[in-house]
Amino acid sequence: MGERKGVNKWYPPDFDPAKHGSINGYYKTHPLRERARKLSQGILIIRFEMPYNIWCDGCKNHIGMGVRYNAEKKKVGNYYTTPIYRFRMKCHLCVNYIEMQTDPATCDYVIVSGAQRKEERWDMAENEQILTTERNEKEKLETDAMYKLDHGGKDKEKLRAAIPSLNELQEHQSGWKDDFQLNSALRRKFRTEKKVIAEEEEKDNAVRLRTGLSIPLVPEREEDKKLASLLTFQSPDSYEDKKQWKRQEISSRSWFNSPSSAAGGAAGSLLQKLGQQGRGAAVAKALSSSTSTLPILVRRKSESSKSETNNTMSTILPVDTHPAAKDTDATDLPSIVNNINVSINTDINSCTTDACKASSSSEEENSIDSCATGKSLVADYSDSDSGSEV
């Protein structure tokens, strides 16, 4: 109440500065209120934060660094002119009280009672930290001139060893001294990079629009340029070359249909794969791999038997067993087929003529029909009188 009224600059009518001194004296209150209830004993209640990890002696629980307590602060002594304060607080997990006090000589806190410290200290010299001067050493420096002179020489050696680090720190600090110049350089760099980014984005959008891509493009790198220079995206044969090759294939093709369609199909697929090279070898391989090449049916008339079952017979003559097909090249396929057809027709004519002379006159018409049909490479089954089977 006194604080609020004092802040609001309100003073009662009977307030006398000489008598009361302040508004708190008028209301007989302290500005710290409940925290100053033991001020007459020299104790002030403060918020104390645990400086390191400890274990409570009462409940044996761990209390972490940074936990805050309402502690009683009291002055218990001096280290030279520096006061030593003691803090007394109650554990929040049990009824045990913990007492700690400051140690100005080591710049640390010391546990007086009620807890044990978790040892996590390290050597300050190994960590290259600033070492505090011991009390005995301070006394020697103040009383012993020779010791002070020797200590001054050691200090100069330390300074000489630390000069490079100090110069580096000063140079680094001087580089950030002019804030306006640094800000101008940063904004200038940002404007330049912004223009470059805008140009790259415009180029990427043009490429995406031209190619119809909807995915973002990654930035171009030197490795990508080298890899792209090594690749070639072009057809091995131009349109004119393909057209000329097609015309050569058509001009070299046979005018007559080949009787062996199966063998011709296999040979044609090989010719398309191999092209103009090895054409003769491919045809020879296709002909040798086929088991039924150029079958020829020949219809003959029997001399002795006149029965319907033994009226005719069929003979299959492969091309590769014919005498005309020997000692020839596979590339002369059309001429081979023509020679074989001529020789076969001659044999058929002679055979059918002898059969016609030996048969009876009642079968002359059939023999004439057989002679007429024998000249063809395909058997004629249109004769209804003959019941021959092929």
Swiss-Prot record:
It comes from the Eukaryota. Keywords: Nucleus. Residues 354-390 are annotated as: Disordered. GO terms for cellular component: post-mRNA release spliceosomal complex; U2-type spliceosomal complex. It holds the Pfam family Saf4_Yju2. It is found in: Nucleus. The keyword Transmembrane helix does not apply. Its main location: nucleus. GO terms for biological process: mRNA splicing, via spliceosome; RNA splicing. May be involved in mRNA splicing. Belongs to the CWC16 family. This is Probable splicing factor YJU2B.
